[in-house]
Amino acid sequence: MSDQTMAGRTVLVTGASDGIGAETALVLAAKGATVHVTGRSADKLRPVAEAVGTEPLIADFSRLDDVRRLADQVAERVETLDLLMNNAGGTFAPSRRTHDGHEPNFQVNHLAPFLLTNLLHPKLSSAGTSLVVNTSSIGNLMGKIVLDDLDYDHRRAIEFPAYGSGKLMNIVFTRGITQRWSDDGVVSVAVHPGPVGSSFGRDSWFVGLLYRSPLKRLVTISVPDGAAPLIALAERGPDPEINGRYFSRFNANGRENKQARDQSIIDGLWERSAALVELT
């Protein structure tokens, strides 16, 4: 019999159609958790949902109305939410705006999970203690948050720096949750899973080219290896000692951009993001 370290816990994993999201969902379900999964591809998500024993939740994070509908569906399904794994994301060519008119790396990597997490705050807080895990990246080091131009309206968006900025925002958002929701029992942590050889860059021609080349084996780790840090954090649960931390795989002191601890950035990103998604 497999260990049941996650028994009794209710989990939502985003970006669970494949890669580390799917792997994390499958392992946590095997460990006894009730796991709900969401992704944008119905065909790819369906077998994952069947394997964990729940109905698939289809949502495209480039459409904020999908995110709002997803939050409503989750709220209907669960009384409480013990663990939210914000794993959806990737690299995107910035030349094409989202359905909502935002730069895609900004919306998919930050704005959509920011909205979802806020909408699910009542379910997280009603659990007594809960954990939010935000999948970030070492790419945060090449990011830069410009509070007056989050959407690249007045500067050129370049794919990898824009992706890095989104991953930096994941860490900053983690710190914002820590400062605002700790009294509600919500613990938040960000994690770089490692350079995983999955489909996260499928919308990027450059990453797609790299991942189709022999170099992939030299520069990436396997999906199970990439999922391992997420699973370890899930099993650790809402430990106050990790609140607000940024892990580089299993290292609790991952290298992070200096903006990640700038209080004006932490407050400003939250306030501007809330305004953009019309949270009151």
Q: Residue ranges of each PLM-predicted region?
A:
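Short, flexible, mixed-charge acidic loops at enzyme active sites
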Residues: 145-151, 203-207, 247
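Short, highly charged low-complexity linear segments
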Residues: 147-149, 232-233, 256-257
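C-terminal boundary and immediately downstream tail of ABC-type ATPase nucleotide-binding domains
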Residues: 270-278
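Short glycine/threonine-rich loop-to-helix capping motif typified by GTGT followed
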Residues: 202, 258-260
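C-terminal helical subdomain
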Residues: 166, 190, 214-254, 263-267, ...
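Rossmann-fold NAD(P)H-dependent dehydrogenase/reductase core
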Residues: 1-199, 277-280
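A short C-terminal helix-loop "cap" of Rossmann-like NAD(P)-dependent dehydrogenase/epimerase domains
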Residues: 152-154, 206-216
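Hydrophobic alpha-helix feature that most strongly marks membrane-spanning transmembrane helices
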Residues: 182, 205, 235-238
